[in-house]
């Protein structure tokens, strides 16, 4: 199982959007385990899962209260599975902080599941917390969405800083797959100056990293999320280019549409 963490240390950077559509695309040819590591639980909602009272979630998995398999739920698609979250996930902060091994706890908890799935997609929380540190520590590869704005550039910088600090401690042993610009604004065939400037700044901040095609500013993403479907199913396959680019980077050949 390859664990791909979607991380960016600010809100509104496209983490859940990226996790949802990338995981859906990968599940066309592989078994995918989604993990919602954000107490806001947006990924859980968009994937159509409702957490039942007393049902195991990521919190119970992190705290080693259940067997890993007991926190995994099957979704409508037979190749898609989910470890959900709810607002109780915030209670994991103290546990991770006091464990002395917070950065590696999630990686250890997921190890027994590795033989059952091809990919694990983790939607990380939007702040520098013990949970976000644990998700980064679990990553084989890290994908950083960043809004095509000054806020997005700052989020990229902060994310790279925490990755570097964890790498120095030996808590992050993976690699950074690249950056996906989010909410790239275009007016017809013309890109906005703010978006162009922000993406140029991203390239300056991280010249060694691959910049994937942008997630454009479009209501179509929200429509597809709300319906729980791919953009291609909505009739807008061109808007999936960022996620197809990530598939290519992962070494997965694009499926031929018949």
Curated annotation (Swiss-Prot):
Has an adenine-nucleotide sandwich dimer structure in common with ParA ATPases. Nucleotide-binding forces changes that create an ATP-binding pocket. One of its GO terms (molecular function) is ATP binding. The record marks 151 as: McdA subfamily signature lysine residue. Mg(2+) binds at residue 16. It catalyses: ATP + H2O = ADP + phosphate + H(+). It comes from Gloeothece citriformis (strain PCC 7424) (Cyanothece sp. (strain PCC 7424)). The lineage of its organism: Bacteria, Bacillati, Cyanobacteriota, Cyanophyceae, Oscillatoriophycideae. Gene3D superfamilies: P-loop containing nucleotide triphosphate hydrolases. McdA and McdB together mediate carboxysome (Cb) spacing, size, ultrastructure and probably inheritance in the cell, together they prevent Cb aggregation. McdA is an ATPase that forms dynamic gradients on the nucleoid in response to adapter protein McdB, which associates with carboxysomes. The interplay between McdA gradients on the nucleoid and McdB-bound carboxysomes result in the equal spacing of Cbs along the cell length. Incorrect positioning (aggregation) of carboxysomes results in reduced CO(2) fixation by encapsulated ribulose-1,5-bisphosphate carboxylase (RuBisCO, cbbL/cbbS), which leads to slower growth. InterPro entries: AAA_dom, DNA_Partitioning_ATPase, P-loop_NTPase. It is found in: Cytoplasm; Cytoplasm, Nucleoid. This is Maintenance of carboxysome distribution protein A. Its EC number is 3.6.4.-. It holds the Pfam family AAA_31. The keyword DNA-binding applies.
